[in-house]
A protein has these predicted regions:
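Short, Lys/Arg-enriched segments at the junction into DNA-binding effector domains
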Residues: 2, 115-171, 175, 218, ...
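Short hydrophobic/Thr-rich beta-strand motif most characteristic of the beta2 strand and flanking loop
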Residues: 6, 24-32, 39
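Two-component/phosphorelay signaling modules centered on CheY-like receiver
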Residues: 9-28
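Acidic catalytic/metal-coordinating carboxylates
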Residues: 32, 58-61
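Active-site beta3 strand of CheY-like receiver
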Residues: 43-49, 54
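Hydrophobic residue at a beta-alpha junction
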Residues: 54-57, 86
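Basic, amphipathic DNA-recognition helix from helix-turn-helix-like DNA-binding domains
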Residues: 64-69, 73-131, 203, 239
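DNA-recognition element of transcription regulators
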Residues: 105-118, 152-162, 187-207, 216-223
Length: 239
């Protein structure tokens, strides 16, 4: 999970980043609201951890921007030294999903992060079988079927397909997809992702006439959308 952290206090940001990184999260720190907003225009994050009092853009102003420009918006944790009830209400009403009072204790931070992520991203079934309309994903075997037809796929094609279906209607940045599937590999050709997208679009028949659209998001990445209730046919999907 990728977390973006905004705090203008360098020491606090470093401490929070270390706690989250040690817990296994991919955490990126920002000390100015403008820098965070610039990143959000081109990258996907799974959670925002925002300090209320940042000089150029307050946490509340960031939340308002996210509400207007991110669809769907990532879950948001708001952190601040303010403890008055009216401040907490203001933060939650603005769109924060939860509220942390500074100084933040590591165990409370991790518990709140896990709780917000759990609510926002449901845990996949324990048997490893996931259903999306007529598409069935067997995670342990890395196999996907359309109806009763097994679709031949490479491991990376399967992982990319599952990532897109798990994030249906959510735009995913190229950087987010690259890091999720290939890690941080600067030597990977830039067309690698586009090639994989083209292949799974054909193999899974992700086209408007079959109720789905897998389309690029300009200067950002890709998004898989369900358009209608019409179902894809297995024969077309494997051509």
């Amino acid at each position: 999970m990728r977390i973006a952290l905004l705090d203008d206090d360098l020491e606090t940001a470093a401490q929070l980043n270390a706690i989250l990184t040690e817990a296994g999260y991919d955490c990126r720190s920002f000390h100015k609201g403008y820098a965070l907003l610039r990143m959000l225009r081109s990258e996907t994050v799974d959670l925002l951890l925002l300090d209320w009092n940042v000089p150029d853009f307050s946490g509340i102003e960031i939340i308002e921007w996210v509400n207007r420009h991110c669809d769907p918006k990532p879950p948001i944790l708001l952190s601040t030294a303010r403890t008055a009830a009216e401040d907490i209400v203001t933060g939650l009403n603005a769109g924060a999903d939860d509220y942390l009072v500074k100084p933040v204790q590591p165990e409370i931070l991790l518990a709140r992060v896990k709780a917000v992520l759990r609510r926002s991203y449901p845990t996949p079934p324990s048997d490893g079988i996931e259903h999306y309309d007529d598409y069935t994903f067997d995670v342990s075997r890395e196999q996907v079927s359309l109806g009763s037809t097994l679709i031949p796929m490479t491991s990376k094609e399967f992982m990319l397909s599952l990532l897109l279906f798990r994030n249906l209607h959510r735009p995913l940045s190229r950087g987010y997809i690259f890091e999720t599937l290939w890690g941080r590999n600067p030597d990977l050709p830039t067309r690698t992702l586009d090639t994989h997208i083209s292949k799974i679009r054909t193999k899974l028949n992700l086209r408007p006439e079959n109720g789905y659209r897998l389309a690029p998001v300009y200067a950002y990445g890709y998004r898989l959308e369900r358009l209608t209730e019409k179902k894809a046919t297995p024969i077309e999907a494997v051509q």
